Amino acid sequence: MKVAYHGHSVVTVDTGDHQLIFDPFITGNSLTDLKPEDVKADVILLTHGHNDHVGDTIEIAKRNNSLVVAPNELAVYLGWKGLNVHPMHIGGSHQFDFGKVKLTQAFHGSAYTEEDSQKIVYTGMPAGILLTVEGRTIFHAGDTGLFSDMKLIGELNHIDLAFLPIGDNFTMGPEDAKLAAEWLRAKQVVPVHYSTFPVIEQDPHAFADSLPGGVGKVLEVGESIEFK
């Protein structure tokens, strides 16, 4: 299984049999190495409804006939757009053919901005996503501030790899993310959601270096971690 980072909060998981993508914000993402038309994904996992996370979901899903797994209201909204969706909610889990998904809390907002009509569409509650595939557990925290129940998430799950936002302003900054990493007890922690825009400019290497030896891992855009 190969897990790769593609800028902002975009993460792909390739199991060989399945190709999954988290929060496919590609168009408008100056850091990514992906092009929407080249993405192959049979599963799209969304943490919340902000445009910089929903991103190119509709185009990718329609072209690949992808299953979109998302918090309930966001899934309903995307279902109205003609996508194949599986709605979930915080605390709920589901065993799919590609693996198990469970949603956790995230302290953030969730709304999709339709810029042409200047409408903001409520898309439910934001979430973190626990994905268990081939005996490994990946935690994508989505956009979130620090919250104490991260300790519980860490106690209940043996997390092999966690993706944590460090950009500050809209999410946790590096100091809070450092504490989140401690509470989650993940074997490896990769920083995400930084330096896409000036207001979230951060040094990911400084964050990784602040964690215990071997825990912090900066993935350059397009770089991957392989589990065997």
From Swiss-Prot:
This is UPF0173 metal-dependent hydrolase BLi03080/BL00413. GO terms for molecular function: hydrolase activity. HAMAP family: UPF0173. PANTHER family: UPF0173 METAL-DEPENDENT HYDROLASE YTKL. Keywords: Hydrolase. It holds the Pfam family Lactamase_B_2. It comes from the Bacteria. The keyword Hydrolase applies. Belongs to the UPF0173 family. SMART domains: Lactamase_B (SM00849). The keyword Hydrolase applies. InterPro entries: Metallo-B-lactamas, RibonucZ/Hydroxyglut_hydro, UPF0173. It comes from Bacillus licheniformis (strain ATCC 14580 / DSM 13 / JCM 2505 / CCUG 7422 / NBRC 12200 / NCIMB 9375 / NCTC 10341 / NRRL NRS-1264 / Gibson 46).
